[in-house]
Amino acid sequence: ITATTGMDALTHAVEAYIGNSTTPGTRKNALDAVKLIFENLDTAYTDGSNKEARRNMLRASYFAGCAFTKSYVGYVHAVAHSLGGQYNVPHGLANAVLLPYVLEAYGKTIHKKLAALAVAAGVADTETPVEEAAAGFIQAIKDMKARFGIGDFIPEIQEEDIPKLSHYADKEANPLYPVPVLMDAGELEKFYYMLMPAKENTVQ
């Protein structure tokens, strides 16, 4: 629970920051949240009795909440909500698994923003080339997932459900969420295929 709810807060902050409806205040909140999460989530996970780490994670969750309440979220949440509704997949777990896939799919459009998040997370500095910093931030998320034993797949997904699930995600996200790259229901299907275990993964 500590790991997945912590990564849920991270997803709130990241999606709020990379979207197209930010303000100076929401950007600051998101950066503060990312910094606190990268500084404290591992400790809170490995030492649940560490009150300082848990207190800082509460602050991070608050800052991330302030950010996305005004700036909204994106396709990570839209897809995750469909998985929760269909299969009862825990929301934080779905977000954690999805986040790197969606960030990579957005491509260069968000590299500059990911670079700023990488600096906040402590995985890059202001002198790091933008593309390198962006890739480093996504890798840091993958590494965090691995440390927490969070995998890359959602085994509950059934291929025959994918058109319906992508329709739900599309209706939630478009036009409500100010995503950096627009995708329709057909394009969103790829994320569900990516989340299927490798032996069943038939994405083309």
Provide a role label for each language-model segment.
Residues 28-32, 36, 56-59, 78-81, ...:
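Amphipathic alpha-helical interaction segments
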Residues 1-71:
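Carboxylate- and glycine-rich phosphate/diphosphate-binding segment that chelates Mg2+/Mn2+
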Residues 37, 41, 64, 117, ...:
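Hydrophobic alpha-helical packing residues
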Residues 114, 124-204:
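C-terminal charged capping/lid subdomain of soluble metabolic enzymes
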Residues 7, 11, 31-34, 38, ...:
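Hydrophobic faces of stable alpha-helices that mediate helix-helix packing
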Residues 71-136, 142:
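C-terminal catalytic subdomain
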Residues 33, 60, 117-120, 168:
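Short acidic/histidine-centered micro-motifs embedded in hydrophobic/aromatic stretches
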